[in-house]
C-alpha cells in the first residue's frame, strides 16, 4: 500500500473530483426531478424515475461483490462498470435531443434503471479499491478534499445549468446540454484512474464459489452485532433520503418552479454538500465515521424542520442543512462499513449495505409519488422525520465505534 501511496492518492483524488463534479449534476435532488416533471407534469412519474434509478442499484452490488472478492486486481472490472455508467448518461443526453413524447420518456426511464445498475456495481468496486490503496486514517481527508473540490465545481455548474443551460435552452435543450457536460467530466475522471492507479494484489481473497452459495453465507456477516444494527439504521435513514427529489417540488409549489429556482436550490444544496466534506472527512479520520453518521442525521433533521416551518431565506437554508447532512451520510455509509469485521468480507458488506439502501430507495419514490398525488406532502414529511429519529436512536444505542470496540 505504501509503495505507490502518493501516486494512488493523487490519482484517486483527481478521478474523484471529475467524477464527483459530473455525477452531482445527475444525482443532485433538483435537476432530474425537474426534468421528469417537465416531461410528464406528474409527481408520480418523478417517483417512478427516482425508483428506477435506485432499483437498478439494488441487485448489482451483490453481483459486483461476488465478482471482486475473489480477484487479485479490481481495477479492470471497475473501469468496465464505470464506463457503462457513463454511457447511460450519454444516452440521456442524446435522447433529450433526438426523441420526444412517449419514446423520450421510455428511453429516459430505461436509462435511469441501467444507470442505477452500473452505479451500484461501481460503488462496490471503487470502495474496495479505496480499501486496498488508501490507509484507514487517510480515507476521510481524501474523500473530504475530493468531495469538496468536485462538489464546489458541481454547485457552480448546477447554478449555471439552471440559469443558463435550462432557462435559455442552450444547444436547443438545456437538460441535454447538462447531461452531456456530466458525461464529459465523468469520462475524464475515469480515464485518469485507468492511467494512474498502481494496484497491488489483494492481501487476502475469498475462494470463488457459486453466487447462490455465497448469498447463503450472508447470515455469517449479520452475526456481527454492530454491522447488523448499522444495516437497520442505514435502511431507516434511506427512507428519509427518498424525500430528497420531492423537496424541490415541495418548494416549487410554494415559490413557483422555474430554472432560476432550480439553479438556486441546486447551488445551496451542492455548495453545502461541498463545503462540509472537509469537516466530515477530518472528523471521521480523528474520531471515527460513526460520529460523522450521527452528525449527518442531526443536520438532516434540522434541514427538515427549516423546510417545513421556515419562510423566505430559511427555505434556502433548509437545503444547506440537507446538503450538509447528505454529504456526511454518504461519506460515513461507504467508509464506516469498511471497518466492520474481516478484510476479505469487505465486498459483501459493501454489497449488503448498498442493497439495503437501494431497496428502500427504489420502493419509496413510487409510494411517495402516489401519496403526494393523492394526499399531498404531509405523509412524506411525517415518514422522513420518523425514520431519521429511529435511525439516530439505533446509531446512538446499538452501533459502537468499530475502531474502539474491536
List PLM regions with ranges.
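Helix-loop junctions on the cytosolic side of multi-pass membrane transporters
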Residues: 175, 190-207, 396-406
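Helix-loop junctions at membrane interfaces in 12-TM secondary transporters
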Residues: 9, 94-111, 308-319
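Structural signature of the two symmetry-related core transmembrane helices
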Residues: 76-92, 183, 291-306, 385
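Helix-loop boundary and gating motifs at the non-cytosolic
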Residues: 1-59, 68, 75-78, 85, ...
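Juxtamembrane intracellular "pre-TM" segments in multi-pass secondary transporters
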Residues: 1-6, 199-232
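Transmembrane alpha-helix termini and helix-breaking/packing motifs in multi-pass membrane transporters
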Residues: 33-38, 66-70, 93-99, 154-173, ...
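Helix-to-loop junctions at the C-terminal end of transmembrane segments
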Residues: 60-73, 165, 276-288, 372
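Intracellular juxtamembrane helix-capping segments at the cytosolic ends
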Residues: 119-134, 328-342
Amino acid at each position: 500500500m505504501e509503495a505507490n501511496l502518493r501516486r494512488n492518492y493523487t490519482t484517486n483524488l483527481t478521478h474523484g473530483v471529475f467524477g464527483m463534479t459530473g455525477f452531482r449534476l445527475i444525482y443532485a435532488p433538483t435537476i432530474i426531478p425537474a426534468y421528469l416533471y417537465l416531461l410528464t407534469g406528474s409527481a408520480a412519474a418523478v417517483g417512478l424515475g427516482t425508483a428506477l434509478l435506485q432499483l437498478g442499484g439494488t441487485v448489482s452490488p451483490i453481483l459486483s461483490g461476488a465478482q471482486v472478492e475473489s480477484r487479485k486486481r479490481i481495477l479492470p472490472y471497475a473501469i468496465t462498470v464505470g464506463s457503462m455508467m457513463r454511457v447511460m448518461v450519454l444516452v440521456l443526453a442524446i435522447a433529450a435531443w433526438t426523441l420526444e413524447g412517449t419514446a423520450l420518456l421510455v428511453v429516459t426511464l430505461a436509462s435511469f434503471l441501467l444507470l442505477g445498475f452500473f452505479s451500484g456495481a461501481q460503488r462496490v468496486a471503487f470502495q474496495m479499491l479505496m480499501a486496498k490503496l488508501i490507509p484507514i486514517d487517510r480515507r476521510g481527508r481524501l474523500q473530504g478534499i475530493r468531495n469538496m473540490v468536485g462538489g464546489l465545481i458541481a454547485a457552480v455548474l448546477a447554478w449555471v445549468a439552471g440559469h443558463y443551460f435550462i432557462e435559455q435552452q442552450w444547444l436547443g435543450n438545456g437538460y441535454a446540454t447538462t447531461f452531456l457536460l456530466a458525461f464529459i467530466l465523468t469520462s475524464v475522471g475515469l480515464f485518469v484512474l485507468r492511467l494512474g492507479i498502481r494496484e497491488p494484489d489483494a492481501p487476502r481473497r475469498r475462494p470463488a464459489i457459486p453466487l447462490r452459495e455465497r448469498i447463503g453465507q450472508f447470515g455469517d456477516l449479520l452475526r456481527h452485532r454492530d454491522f447488523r444494527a448499522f444495516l437497520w439504521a442505514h435502511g431507516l435513514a434511506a427512507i428519509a433520503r427518498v424525500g430528497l427529489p420531492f423537496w424541490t417540488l415541495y418548494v416549487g409549489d410554494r415559490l413557483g418552479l422555474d430554472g432560476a429556482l432550480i439553479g438556486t436550490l441546486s447551488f445551496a444544496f451542492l455548495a453545502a454538500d461541498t463545503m462540509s466534506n472537509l469537516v466530515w472527512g477530518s472528523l471521521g479520520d480523528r474520531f471515527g465515521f460513526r460520529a460523522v453518521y450521527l452528525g449527518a442525521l442531526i443536520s438532516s433533521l434540522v434541514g427538515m424542520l427549516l423546510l417545513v416551518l421556515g419562510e423566505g431565506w430559511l427555505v434556502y437554508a433548509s437545503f444547506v442543512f440537507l446538503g450538509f447532512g447528505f454529504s456526511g451520510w454518504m461519506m460515513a455509509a461507504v467508509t464506516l462499513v469498511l471497518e466492520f469485521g474481516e478484510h476479505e468480507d469487505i465486498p459483501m458488506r459493501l454489497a449488503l449495505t448498498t442493497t439495503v439502501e437501494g431497496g428502500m430507495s427504489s420502493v419509496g419514490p413510487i409510494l411517495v409519488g402516489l401519496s403526494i398525488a393523492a394526499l399531498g406532502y404531509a405523509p412524506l414529511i411525517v415518514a422522513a422525520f420518523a425514520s431519521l429519529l429511529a435511525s439516530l436512536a439505533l446509531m446512538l444505542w446499538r452501533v459502537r465505534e468499530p475502531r474502539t470496540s474491536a
